[in-house]
UniProtKB/Swiss-Prot annotation:
The keyword Transferase applies. It is an enzyme of class 2 (transferase). Belongs to the IPP transferase family. The record marks 105, 128 as: Interaction with substrate tRNA. Its EC number is 2.5.1.75. Substrate binds at residues 16-21. PANTHER family: TRNA DIMETHYLALLYLTRANSFERASE (PTHR11088:SF60). This is tRNA dimethylallyltransferase. Disulfide bonds: none annotated. NCBIfam families: miaA. It comes from Bacillus cereus (strain AH187).
Amino acid sequence: MGEVQREKVAVIIGPTAVGKTKLSIDLAKALNGEIISGDSMQIYRTMDIGTAKVTKEEMDGIPHYMVDIKNPEESFSVAEFQERVRKHIREITERGKLPIIVGGTGLYIQSVLFDYQFTDDAGDAIYREQMEKLALERGVEYVHKKLQEVDPESAERIHANNVRRVIRALEIFHTTGEKMSDQLEKQENELLYDVSLIGLTMDREMLYDRINLRVDIMMDQGLLEEVEGLYNRGIRDCQSIQAIGYKEIYDYFEDRVSLEEAVSQLKTNSRRYAKRQLTWFRNKMDVTWFDVTDGEKTSEILRYIEGKLQRKSNNSK
């Protein structure tokens, strides 16, 4: 009975710059869908260029959710993402449309699809403040090494610059004696939705070339001015500016590096992030992959999703 009632959801994942945005809009048009961003940084207003946020023109009339919902000064948690996205899925389904989640933030997407439970029970404000102080005084790498010692799986998954999540993982271990990675693993067994989960991949060198080109285009589009606007507003030590594309340019404004060095580091970090994204998706999710090295596979992907949706409809009768 539970199988019959599960809502249908299409999910498009893949590394940065692989072509998810265009595909998602093409599929939404063909499948009567509406799009939910699965990117943890596109939620922030005024951070458009550096997050490669979909433009109004690109949307082409397709409704998009989880974009521009927070100010850069505000924090945002996986738990809040989960709650909001599940609400959007219900509402889109009730309108007779297909929810299509698109993005590259693995943990966020996973938290929606699986029965992840987020509670405030495992919290210790004093310990958290101690870790935050350590991160400020001794650097984020020091705190990340502490996480490596107690929960290497989470340390592998969470980048050192994502200080909030590093400290949260340490806090969970400190208060419960249980690794965050173990808690998540327990909850990874059952999908809450009828999911068509597809991934885009391509030849690594081609992907890296696309990433480098994308950074050059971002600079031409005004990324420097976009980050300068945030910097001049006094935004410091916020979750938003830990994003790739912002922290590197911040280093330039704080006279740590030249602009050329900042752009070079941005390209390097973007390539590394793409590699981590692919590793995460391949290790954590049962994905049907489509290689788009030789061009887009929209028709093939559409046939796959339509076939899967049709089989599910027949099975529910």
